[in-house]
Amino acid sequence: MASITQLFDDLCEALLPAAKTHLGQRSVNRKRAKRSLKKVAYNALFTNLFQDETQQLQPDMSKLPARNKILMLSFDLRVGGLGPKADRLEELVEELEAAPCCPLLEVGSVLDLLVQLAGSGPPQVLPRKRDYFLNNKHVGRNVPYSGYDCDDLSVFEMDVQSLISREECLCHSMIQETLQVMEAAPGTGLPTVGLFSFGDPCGDRFERDTRVSLFGALVHSRTYDMDVRLGLPPVPDNADLSGLAIKVPPSVDQWEDEGFQSASNLTPDSQSEPSVTPDVDLWEAALTYEASKRRCWERVGCPPGHREEPYLTEAGRDAFDKFCRLHQGELQLLAGGVLQAPQPVLVKECELVKDVLNVLIGVVSATFSLCQPAQAFVVKRGVHVSGASPESISSLLSEVAEYGTCYTRLSHFSLQPVLDSLYSKGLVFQAFTSGLRRYLQYYRACVLSTPPTLSLLTIGFLFKKLGRQLRYLAELCGVGAVLPGTCGGGPRAAFPTGVKLLSYLYQEALHNCSNEHYPVLLSLLKTSCEPYTRFIHDWVYSGVFRDAYGEFMIQVNHEYLSFRDKLYWTHGYVLISKEVEDCVPVFLKHIAHDIYVCGKTINLLKLCCPRHYLCWSDVPVPRISVIFSLEELKEIEKDCAVYVGRMERVARHSSVSKEEKELRMEIAKQELIAHAREAASRVLSALSDRQMSERMALDARKREQFQRLKEQFVKDQERRQAARQEELDDDFSYARELRDRERRLKSLEEELERKARQALVDHYSKLSAEAARREQKALWRIQRHRLESARLRFLLEDEKHIQEMLKAVSEAHQPQEPPDVLLSVHPQVTSPGPEHPEGGQGCDSGSAEQHSPAWDGWNRPGLLTPQPLKPLAVGAGGRGLQQAEGARPFSDSLSIGDFLPVGPGAEPSVQTGMVPLLEVALQTINLDLPPSAPGEAPAAASTQPSRPQEYDFSTVLRPAVATSPAPGPLQAAECSLGSSGLQLWEDSCGKMDACGSASRETLLPSHPPRRAALEEGSSQPTERLFGQVSGGGLPTGDYASEIAPTRPRWNTHGHVSDASIRVGENVSDVAPTQPRWNTHGHVSNASISLGESVSDVAPTRPRWNIHGHVSNASIRVGENVSDVAPTRPRWNTHGHVSNASIRVGENVSDVAPTRPRWNTHGHVSDASISLGESVSDMAPARPRWNTHGHVSDASISLGESVSDMAPTRPRWNTHGHVSDTSIRVGENVSDVAPIRSRCNTHGHVSDASISLGEPVSDVVSTRPRWNTHVPIPPPHMVLGALSPEAEPNTPRPQQSPPGHTSQSALSLGAQSTVLDCGPRLPVEVGPSLSSPSSGCGEGSISVGENVSDVAPTQPWWPNTPGDSVSEELGPGRSGDTEDLSPNWPLNSQEDTAAQSSPGRGEEAEASAAEAQGGEQAYLAGLAGQYHLERYPDSYESMSEPPIAHLLRPVLPRAFAFPVDPQVQSAADETAVQLSELLTLPVLMKRSITAPLAAHISLVNKAAVDYFFVELHLEAHYEALRHFLLMEDGEFAQSLSDLLFEKLGAGQTPGELLNPLVLNSVLSKALQCSLHGDTPHASNLSLALKYLPEVFAPNAPDVLSCLELRYKVDWPLNIVITEGCVSKYSGVFSFLLQLKLMMWALKDVCFHLKRTALLSHMAGSVQFRQLQLFKHEMQHFVKVIQGYIANQILHVTWCEFRARLATVGDLEEIQRAHAEYLHKAVFRGLLTEKAAPVMNVIHSIFSLVLKFRSQLISQAWGPPGGPRGAEHPNFALMQQSYNTFKYYSHFLFKVVTKLVNRGYQPHLEDFLLRINFNNYYQDA
């Protein structure tokens, strides 16, 4: 057996745990632990060994009672510092003794047992003494202070001292450890191996700086409050401060932690001692730390750097439970029993899941109990599952309990009510609760379908959204989180019912339109609206009122429904409230009144017109309900449209509308006017005929009488003249004889004098002449003698010179003479011969520039020798040329007339001597011209032998050869002209400045001749000498600016010389040439040189070019052109490059389009856009009648980039060509409208609108066409220009015979994919290349382009991959374009082409079948060639309804997400979609408001038509205006005169105001009226308001007791009410007063006139004054009468008529009429506010009546005295007048103020009338 020591060692080893560390614990020192265990073991051993001695020492304890023993143990506890435990023990003992069961003996025994067991437990180590006062062994009191060096304090501070020493050791290596810790390997250098060193106070700097410092003694626990201020304990004054000299290492900088110390509580030592803490902060180092690249075993498989540590829960459920228990124990220890934590109840998770699922549907369980007063579920405290804390489980379960509470409350809220007589909440609330119940049923289904195998967290997550909805619905229904029936502190508002409930739900849906509650609210709103929409449906469609609970908008008063006047309309059906929100929901607020009026109107129509079509119509009505489904919405809109259409059709057949009635009346009125005009014209014509016949008869009589008088006068005049002549002859015969004798004598004398004078003159002149002759002869002899030698010398030289000349002529036949001499003649020839119909445009009057004729190199490449140019300055205005060299002899006998063309029948000149001279001149010119082509002269001779040669003055003395030379070697020479020839030619030509393009074409030699011998009206097209490029208007490479255009003419074989612009030059502001009648166009026809850059060039207008060439182009090759006006090529049989109005390769902008015509086979020349250019903003062309279109028909260049192009409209193309394209080759086209496919039997390249090999997207399909003739583009065209922003010329394709090989859309040199596709041509294409109908491509096919949004046509190579095929948009329709052009027949060329290919129909069918069969293969090839990234067709997630996203209000459903096309979306899904896409107001408007508005408009229109058409409402208004407003002047005048005459006769009221008198007065007035025979006149009657006793004298309202009544029947009395008639009567009464005033003044006038006639009152002063008084009063009354007539009868009536034209329902008619009457009363000053003004007017009226009575009451006095007759009452009348004047001026002031203040602006009319001449203003 081992020794005791060995056994104790083994025991300690067995008890010691394994050597491992845990989180938050220090590493165990095994030696120290083993030592402590041994100490315990030995103590136990020694205690038992010396037990006897200890028992002897102890007193006898058994005799003491158990209570005393327990108190002794309590004292021991107090001594040990466990005071609370001692107190607790004493309390328990006292409670036990005080218990009722205390006398039991067992209690004492049990206490004894407990006392005996008191020390038998394991020894408990007392906690370290942290508090000196708490663990003091002096029980119950505190001992006096004994200094810092006492025992207790030293024991208390032992651990502090150890920590301080350790701190001093750590400070030395702190810097190195801090710097090395970041880069060290994991786990090295740390104070403990544990990861969380909670127990190590040295591991944290905060711990060192606070708890370990001097103030650590003052810190009771870790504090987090920043406002804590630590202070020293109270120390007595006599305390020993020696202990304060402890060296405490100062470690905290005072600025680092201001919350725990400040300068006030720092000791001097800690302030002054320098800090030894290193400056390097570990946290700063951690922030700036960069992860090491080192890898170690802890980081295998992890990237270097920081890694998240695992969560505590990852250690497992048991570890988490232990950790929770540990912390709960710590909390209980710290709280000391104050914190009573609930006892944890561990429940299995499966049971808890069952309880959770139960409580979600309101089922009580052990975990969830229901609090009945609060109707809320309560979670049992302490419930938890393994692996989760009770708090987390409680928070999760409390949420679930809240969901259950909401469910329970909503279930109680939505219980089906008992429908008895006490129920008053209405149908809307029932529908709402039913919708709520349905939602709760779906919720229960969700809960019950949840599998119980899910975890708590999963269930909580799954039901979070439903729980939120339940909570929201509970709050919506008023049964939310707060207790039911209370809202905060006050009572909760009652839940709305009826209409207010719908408004409440609608507003809530609007507020929640963007969250998850929106669909639930929409569902509840839809369900709740069902009863209301049913009520609205019945009320609006049929007028039926069904409201069992009185919750809707209308209340019925049955007693008023039996009335037949306005009360039926106003009181039969009444709105329940004046507030609109109380009557209708918010979403129908804007049509609430319309709904109300619509039902009333239908009931009125049923009552008044039971056979009305609205009452018996069987047209099905559209339903009214809240709808969120797209399909149903579309169906409702369709139903509304169908319903409205059918009802309008029924209305048209069964009734006449107001508009139709007005139209019929207008038509009848116009017909009446026409008949009246015809009758008037007939009468007028008869009158005019009669007048004309009378006038003619009278005129004949007058002429006859005049003729007789004239004859008599002539005879008498002749007789008198004869008598006078005889007298004159007798008187003057003797005088004549005397005058003749004197005249003869005088003439004889003058003759004698003249002869004498002439004899003297002759004598002296003869003498002087002889003297002069003698003198001259003498002088001549002297001079002859002097010059004899010189004369002889001169004669010899002259003879010698003549001999030399003769010799030279005989030897040399062609003398060298520069062409300048001959050229100088040309500008003078400005008038062409008769064969030039275009005028002399070849000879421009401006300055021209001449060039030396070095042109042989053009036609003869081998002779291209550079020659120096001799430019000649040309004078302006045809002055002739100043030659650079000296003058050469030119024979006088050679005139310019020899060069002029001879007429067709002219005889040859007989002067034989002139012929050699002309020959010499022509030979001289011909030296500088190139030789003609071989075979040209014979052809000329053989073709036109009878026609003499003509001279074309557009060139220099060039004979016109109307021949057709066969193509010979010259063609080869021309075609071989390459770039080297061009370069040599440019070198030889140089550059010159041009002043006029006319002379440029005129003065340059050119060959071969290009003018055909054409007479007027005749043209002989001949064959073309192809390929001549010899004609250029300017030297190649020239630079020309501002050159006027030439107009080349009649050139059979054009030359380079015909071009007015040099090749390669840069031209600006050049007006283009207009080439004409070019049978075989050449490069010479081009008005633009090759390679030049041109801007601002006006286009040429080429004409009649049978074979167009490059020369027809008005744009230079390769130039840069802007602002080019287009050409208009015409009648080109074989179009060529020359027909193009845009330069090849140019940059063109802003080009206006051309309109080419009749091109059978167009060429490249027909293109109005350069090849390869980039064109934008193009106006489209409209090509026409192109049988075989060509590249020239294209309105888009090859390789260009086009945007914003309007589509072309190609027509009738049997064999389409490239010319029909609307898209350029190689372009990038966007937004191009589709091309209309045409009747193309054999499709061509042009039929495709998609490039070869291009990627195409968004292509609108056109009709496929099939092409059997596929041309290969020839290789002679050159591409490669870029022209931005060009408006291209889009020519009309020109007529050209088929088979022109130069008709190309592409070239070999172009960068195109057609060349690559060449080998892939089908086999059948080969033979078709030579067929006559194979044009070169008519299509909109761009080579190498990238096209998007292009309207494609069918591919033109059926089997070629790289093209794209689309289906047809429609049969020949493109957009809204419609081809209105006639179907022109095919021309003869097409007929011959059709005849030459007999199997054309079979070929077409075969090619069609082949093309259809090749489409699929083509598409497959295309799909294989392009692998496009496509949208996914369907995903599983995409087949579900989409989650609402941010663009929900914006994106339509079609663009939101792609869904599986096989999934047919149900109505509910579309409802979800539509609620996402459309806002709620829009949905309500389209589902409810739309059918309501449609039917309401129908009903209102029917009611308005019924009243206006059937009841003739407007005729009643007019009758009221005619009679009661006195618009009928005859009626008003007659009525007033009859009444006032009886009144003025002094009749009493009884005599005047009886029915017989009044009826006779009225009937007489109606007989005088214009409208007395109308049926509405029978409604008039005169009635008495009251019977006055007497008529008041001078009272203007003497007849106010009388009124004119107008009877209005049902149902018109709804609109024309009694109140309206009374207002009419008020206006009538005032108008009657005006009539009384007029009658009184008329009576005054009558009396004054009668008195003046009887008493001769002309000289009376008073009479004159009374006339003036009467006149002023009459003016005033007439002003008021005119004002009333204008404002009431005209202005107000016109406004009323305009308003009636726009009324929509009966209410509007009623309002319009009431407003009309109100305006009439207001403008008539009959309102209460205008009473003061009316009082003034009444006073003035009484003064007028008073004036009358004063005048007629007494007779005038006798006319005695100087003042004439006088009236006795004149003073009274003058006083009345003065008062009248005062009142009228006062009225003027009052009215002026009213107008100025803007109160009654209509009174401006009154002011203008009364003060027209400023009478009142001046006064």
From Swiss-Prot:
Keywords: Cytoplasm, Cytoskeleton, Microtubule, Repeat
Principal subcellular localization: cytoplasm
GO biological process: cytoplasmic microtubule organization; meiotic cell cycle; microtubule nucleation; mitotic cell cycle; spindle assembly
Listed InterPro entries: GCP, GCP6_N, GCP_C, GCP_C_sf, GCP_N
Start-end of Polar residues biased regions: 1297-1314, 1384-1398
Biased composition (Low complexity): 1321-1335
Region (Disordered): 810-889, 929-951, 1000-1023, 1271-1412
GO molecular function annotation: gamma-tubulin binding; microtubule binding
Compartment(s) of residence: Cytoplasm, Cytoskeleton, Microtubule organizing center, Centrosome
Domain of life from the UniProt record: Eukaryota
Pfam families: GCP6_N (PF19340), GCP_C_terminal (PF04130), GCP_N_terminal (PF17681)
Region of interest called 9 X 27 AA tandem repeats, as start-end residue ranges on this chain: 1027-1269
Residue spans of the Sequence repeats: 1027-1053, 1054-1080, 1081-1107, 1108-1134, 1135-1161, 1162-1188, 1189-1215, 1216-1242, 1243-1269
GO cellular component: centrosome; cytosol; gamma-tubulin complex; gamma-tubulin ring complex; membrane; microtubule; spindle pole
PANTHER family, per database record: GAMMA TUBULIN COMPLEX PROTEIN, GAMMA-TUBULIN COMPLEX COMPONENT 6
Disease: Microcephaly and chorioretinopathy, autosomal recessive, 1: A syndrome characterized by microcephaly, cognitive impairment, underdeveloped retina and choroid, and epilepsy in some patients. The more anterior parts of the retina, near the periphery and pars plana, have a grayish hue and diminutive vasculature similar to retinopathy of prematurity. Visual impairment becomes evident during the first year of life.
UniProt similarity note: Belongs to the TUBGCP family.
Subunit record text: Component of the gamma-tubulin ring complex (gTuRC) consisting of TUBGCP2, TUBGCP3, TUBGCP4, TUBGCP5 and TUBGCP6 and gamma-tubulin TUBG1 or TUBG2. TUBGCP2, TUBGCP3, TUBGCP4, TUBGCP5 and TUBGCP6 assemble in a 5:5:2:1:1 stoichiometry; each is associated with a gamma-tubulin, thereby arranging 14 gamma-tubulins in a helical manner. Gamma-tubulin at the first position is blocked by TUBGCP3 at the last position, allowing 13 protafilaments to grow into a microtubule.
Role noted for this protein: Component of the gamma-tubulin ring complex (gTuRC) which mediates microtubule nucleation. The gTuRC regulates the minus-end nucleation of alpha-beta tubulin heterodimers that grow into microtubule protafilaments, a critical step in centrosome duplication and spindle formation.
Protein name: Gamma-tubulin complex component 6
Organism per entry: Homo sapiens (Human)
